């Protein structure tokens, strides 16, 4: 069933969204992108005359914690939807059940943070650090049993289930996956955002226009190893950049000064270089780097060879020759995946490389390439430089997107697709 086909008139819909938005010290939303992304789905249900029950998490609470209450975002959700959204001070308690039961056509109810309950994630809480294996096993068994009852209560509020939370699709949580078992195929579906995310990933994985270039940044090669190895079976060009570059440089015998490095991953870096060559993948690493004498926007800087970074200096961004090298490859590409910046883009003096990569992707997109940007830092990059609406798709899912591209089955997607 698709959301477009479904008529919500007279139906109660439990909609799992990802309203895990950043809040400042006064609990004001600093970036409402995730809320806005869910609006088309919520508006469709309202317009049909359905009754909407919104479930989400916020942060990583270890129990009921006022600072993580979804009440903080209630006024903004009401404003964006143009309706007076009701609030339940629990997600499965009497208040939630009562308000859900009394909903009328067009009304919207926001439940309190689902993660106030350990049952949402299905992980025990409150175990002491020195708990025995038996105690851990008993606690896990207890929370799994309680999770079933928790999931049943969430499902009992609604006639249908809509998952529009791609950001948590890689989690087999109560509200993201398990709840789907309580609805038949005709009464569970993706929301519009989830549909777009799934299509974007499928296009990158299965409907590839070549040349296909992946740009992987970030500070650690160890956190990207699975996705890098999966991409080596798919891409024509793999650009590795960001902090992980210096592990490759050191592995090749270069001098990296004070640059970030994973000394225990040098063999892994050499193995990736070898595998790329064996598979005929064009592996592109930076050739020059903008270095600083300290980790500061106002530090003294110079540009030097990647292989010859002075002893007391650290790599902070790619240099002009690397920018030109990356740009040439990107402009020749027809499918582009970007995950991770080229340097410390949060500092304006070291954001030039990331901006240049973003602008090259925009130019390639204008020339007909399909470009997918995903992962927290690269999304922050395109937003910072005003490029988000000039690429093909910006994913809301960090970990979920990476796991999908690694080739893993995402529980939140499998629960709907079967």
Swiss-Prot record:
**EC top class named in words:** transferase
List of residues binding ATP: 224, 315, 346, 375-378
User: What CDD domains does UniProt report for this protein, alphabetically?
Assistant: Phosphoglycerate_kinase
Domain of life the protein comes from:
Bacteria
Q: Where in the cell is it found?
A: Cytoplasm
Name its pathway.
Carbohydrate degradation; glycolysis; pyruvate from D-glyceraldehyde 3-phosphate: step 2/5
* Primary localization class, coarse: cytoplasm
Task: Say if the entry is tagged with keyword Translocase.
Answer: no
What does the subunit section of this Swiss-Prot or TrEMBL entry state?
Monomer.
Family to which this protein belongs: Belongs to the phosphoglycerate kinase family.
What this protein is called in its record is: Phosphoglycerate kinase
């Amino acid at each position: 069933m698709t959301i477009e086909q479904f008529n919500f008139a007279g139906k109660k819909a439990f909609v799992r969204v990802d309203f895990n938005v950043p809040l400042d010290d006064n609990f004001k939303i600093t970036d409402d992108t995730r809320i806005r992304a869910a609006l088309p789905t919520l508006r469709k249900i309202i317009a049909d005359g359905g009754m909407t029950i919104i479930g989400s998490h916020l942060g990583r609470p270890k129990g009921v914690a006022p600072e993580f209450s979804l009440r903080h975002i209630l006024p903004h959700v009401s404003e964006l939807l143009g309706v007076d959204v009701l609030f339940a001070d629990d997600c499965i308690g009497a208040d939630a059940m009562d308000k859900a039961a009394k909903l009328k056509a067009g009304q919207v109810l926001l439940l309190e943070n689902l993660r106030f309950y350990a049952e949402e994630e299905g992980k025990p809480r409150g175990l002491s650090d020195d708990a025995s294996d038996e105690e851990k096993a008993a606690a896990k068994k207890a929370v799994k049993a309680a999770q079933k009852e928790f999931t049943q209560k969430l499902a009992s509020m609604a006639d249908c289930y809509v998952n529009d939370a791609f950001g948590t699709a890689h989690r087999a949580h109560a509200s993201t996956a398990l709840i789907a078992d309580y609805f038949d195929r005709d009464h569970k579906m993706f929301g519009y955002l989830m549909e777009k995310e799934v299509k974007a990933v499928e296009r990158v994985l299965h409907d590839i226009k070549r040349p296909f270039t992946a740009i992987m940044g970030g500070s650690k090669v160890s956190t990207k190893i699975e996705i890098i190895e999966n991409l080596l079976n798919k891409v024509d060009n793999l650009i590795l950049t960001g902090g992980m570059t210096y592990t490759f440089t050191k592995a090749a015998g270069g001098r990296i000064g004070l640059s970030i490095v994973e000394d225990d991953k040098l063999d892994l870096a050499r193995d990736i270089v070898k595998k790329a060559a064996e598979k005929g993948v064009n592996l592109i690493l930076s050739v020059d780097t903008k270095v600083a004498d300290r980790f500061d926007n106002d530090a003294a800087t110079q540009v030097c060879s990647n292989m010859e970074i002075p002893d007391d200096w650290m790599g902070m961004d790619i240099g002009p020759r690397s920018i030109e090298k990356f740009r040439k490859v990107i402009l020749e590409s027809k499918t582009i995946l970007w995950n991770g910046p080229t340097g410390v883009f949060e500092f304006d003096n070291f954001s030039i490389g990331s901006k240049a990569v973003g602008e090259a992707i925009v130019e390639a997109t204008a020339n007909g390439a399909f470009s997918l940007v995903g992962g927290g830092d690269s999304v922050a990059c395109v937003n910072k430089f005003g490029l988000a609406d000039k690429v093909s798709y910006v994913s809301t899912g960090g970990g979920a997107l990476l796991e999908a591209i690694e080739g893993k089955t995402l529980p939140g997607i499998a629960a709907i697709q079967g």
